[in-house]
Amino acid sequence: PAPAPHGVVVKVMANGVCRSDWHGWMGHDPDIQLPHVPGHELSGVVEAVGKDVTKWRIGDRVTVPFVGGCGICPECHTGNHQVCDAQFQPGFTHWGSFAEYVGIHYADVNLVALPDTLTFDTAASLGCRFVTSFRAVVDQGRVSAGQWVAVHGCGGVGLSAIMIASAAGANVVAVDISEQALALARQLGAVATVNANQVADVVEAVVEITQGGAHVSLDALGHPTTCFNSISNLRKRGKHVQVGLMLADHSTPAVPMSKVIANELEILGSHGMQAHRYGAMLAMIQSGKLAPEKLIG
């Protein structure tokens, strides 16, 4: 492709695949119009630069959030590019990175420079699951040391959240139906695990482990059951963060609203992360507090 005046073309060096891609090729995403090129977890090198781009040069090593902002709408003006009114999503609203080259719009707003010490493979793995989890745990959940955090679903997003919450000093309880996933969760910092297929009541199990309920709980899977359990296992005034996508038949889950009201619970969404927040995450990676390469399979 040729770069837009405000965009760049990136030579793709590495890609990731995630559940959002699955939703796309299953037809759950109305933004996708065929023919289409998916791919939104990417890293690479700037190959061409649009005439209005000021911050980037050919040869720069870069990655990009999977939700990009236009830089001029009201949400972007408040720094919330991840909910931009005219958001750009490679692989969804536009052709993506499952190709040799990909066009990235609004480059001065959305591109992220990669440290020389970060490999392209690791950088691509940050693109969706890790940055999504970082924002969910750090910015939305506001997790702090000593808190109890429950993570429902130990796929890529959930395991990333476990690593990040543990690095923040939280006590993490991981919930899944796979013993293999739960074993990996323990390796990444979970202090307790719950196999949802082996307990009578997931909510009771988490409340017992946390001695009253989690301060913060994440549904990292995106299913009516995990959403309900995540809200229900909170202690009073706790925070539920919905990270896993809930599309198609799962888009209108039951919510224990009486408990939300009586216990003053917070229900928060989390949708990607802005390019300007990558610095905090990359600093933790470079210091050794986070090791996303452990999640590459």
Regions found by a protein language model. Name each.
Residues 61-62, 116-199, 204-205:
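Mid-domain Rossmann-like dinucleotide-binding core that forms the NAD(H)/NADP(H) cofactor-binding site
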Residues 234-235:
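Helix-to-beta-strand junctions that scaffold the AdoMet/dcAdoMet cofactor pocket
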Residues 63, 215-218:
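N-terminal Rossmann-like NAD(P) cofactor-binding module of classical short-chain dehydrogenase/reductase
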Residues 243-244:
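Acidic carboxylate diad motif detector
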Residues 203, 207, 211, 248-297:
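C-terminal substrate-binding/catalytic core of Rossmann-like NAD(P)-dependent dehydrogenases/reductases
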Residues 1-15, 28-74, 115-117:
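Glycine-rich beta-strand-centered segment in the early N-terminal region that forms part
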Residues 55, 70-152:
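NAD(P)H dinucleotide-binding glycine-rich loop of Rossmann-like/cofactor-binding domains
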